[in-house]
Amino acid sequence: FVIDASGVLANPHTPKITGADTFTGAMFHSGHWDHSVAIDGKRVGVIGSGCSAAQIVPAIAGQVGRLTLFMGKAQWIIPRSDRLHGPLERWVRTLPGIRHAIRLLVFTFYDIRFVAFRRYPGLAGISRVVKAHYRKGLQKDLDTYVADEKLRRHMMPDYEMGCRRLIPSNAYLPALSRENVDVDISGIEAITP
């Protein structure tokens, strides 16, 4: 099987790969998932390393027999803020105006983070601090989950943070370290039957 995960947002992009029309297995784009295809115990290839792959790989890695991720350009993978909210936090959100205030704080945080990626005079220091923080965090995660040094180097983006969509995930890198998961960084020349 080959699952193409190289699309962009709501308009799926299927790359033109030599030999794709000769592939005899099931092949579909993640934006048009074919739920009739059984992948349990099968060899599956995922093309692309963006947000779709970061969701698909952890979701199916424990289900398939062997998974190969055909990785393209390195991506900025940042921690996803997944956590359970305690009873006090849930209760506070029921108070009038609190939900709106929390939403305003969240928007403000993301607006500040966005500004940090811009090169406005006077904000270069903030930008450097934010980028250094995320670079250090990604390097730590790569060191933790990716044993192969060459792959670690390939997975560290060589472009500025914020140039491409960030990938928030706590499951992607651990999934790539599973025994049944391989990462191929050699590039795809052709698909064979």
Stretches found by the model and what they are:
Residues 4-140, 144:
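Rossmann-like dinucleotide-binding core of oxidoreductases
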Residues 150-152, 171-173, 186-192:
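Internal nucleotide-binding/catalytic subdomain
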Residues 150-163, 167:
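Helix-loop-beta segment of a Rossmann-like dinucleotide-binding subdomain
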Residues 36, 160, 181-193:
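A conserved short coil-to-beta-strand element within the FAD-binding core of flavoproteins
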